[in-house]
Amino acid sequence: MDITTTQFKRCDVIKAAGRVDSSTAPGLEEAMNAIIESGRFKIVFDMSEVNFMSSKGWWVLIETQKKCKRYKRGEIVLVAVREEIRSSLDMVGMGSYFRIFDDVTSAVGSF
């Protein structure tokens, strides 16, 4: 899995490509934590090139969301989530836990 991070004035955008599973999720967690540890809590996660998301990947996103929302500091929003990945999120009842946008521009503009 490849991860790129771009910092904007209002938020940070993380883009991942490939599979997010038990072997690659720690890298995603490290990228998310680096942003939070720098005092930034508004994160856009671009999933347009993510083709698989395991429960470990969802766990990373849920834990990141908890950290971002603590004390109403911010949140993580998702972009371009593939239908099969979105349905797995809905299946476990977490579909409403994240705001989901069609494109990065809309997601960045939401902050």
Describe these PLM feature segments.
Residues 1-15:
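Short beta-strand/loop segment at the start of cytosolic alpha/beta domains
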Residues 99-103:
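Short acidic-hydrophobic, aromatic-tinged amphipathic segments that line or gate anion-handling sites
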Residues 22-97:
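Amphipathic alpha-helical interaction surfaces in cytosolic regulatory modules
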